[in-house]
């Protein structure tokens, strides 16, 4: 258990910084890492993805608080953009989480990997060619976008930054404000996803001690003990890095995760 907690502390430090920097909630680091670590504490193979996803959402809540708080101070949250998008995403994540929690591990793992590949490709293409804004952010687009973002985020156990950021930038919001708005949405998304996986895994006799549904509490504590603080460092870094560096860093990060998932 000591080794497990120590590893979770290290994962949390990295995930928190990336969450603040990219507005991703850290899930793209946390989920694949937990798939490797959870067998140490006797989580059965059939429940690895469900537990990794549920635990990731729980950590997103804590990490997202620190990240969103810092972005708010920097003035990076566009409240007009998130007032419809955030609640729609929350509802979508909760409903889809109930379904995802019951999927076979191999299926959910493949869905996760495919989503990561999509995100990586999306960011690489946006670097090669600047996107021309031809769409506006309307209530209808916010509802449709929120539903789709919630579905994808639920399957990937992420704060939705990889979907929210390009969605907002395509509608005229600059990338720093899109990242800040994504961090705020990610915090609320995490709350919804967390409760969804608690409900879907409630009373499962195969889960180890100190579990709450499909959430393994020691992992949550270990990861958030460091991620809460490093997320603020990552959020501060967005004010110092140029836009092109942010895009390249985001794309490179997603590509590395995608390769890792396919080699697993």
Swiss-Prot record:
Localization per Swiss-Prot or TrEMBL: Cell membrane
One matching Pfam family: TauE
Swiss-Prot/TrEMBL keywords: Cell membrane, Membrane, Transmembrane, Transmembrane helix, Transport
Domain of life, per lineage: Bacteria
Ranges that cross the membrane: 4-24, 28-48, 49-69, 81-101, 107-127, 147-167, 183-203, 210-230, 243-263
Bilayer disposition of the protein: Multi-pass membrane protein
InterPro entries xref list: TM_pro_TauE-like
Gene Ontology cellular-component annotations: plasma membrane
PANTHER family hit by this protein: MEMBRANE TRANSPORTER PROTEIN HI_0806-RELATED (PTHR43483:SF3)
Similarity comment text for this entry: Belongs to the 4-toluene sulfonate uptake permease (TSUP) (TC 2.A.102) family.
Protein name: Probable membrane transporter protein HI_0902
Species for this entry: Haemophilus influenzae (strain ATCC 51907 / DSM 11121 / KW20 / Rd)
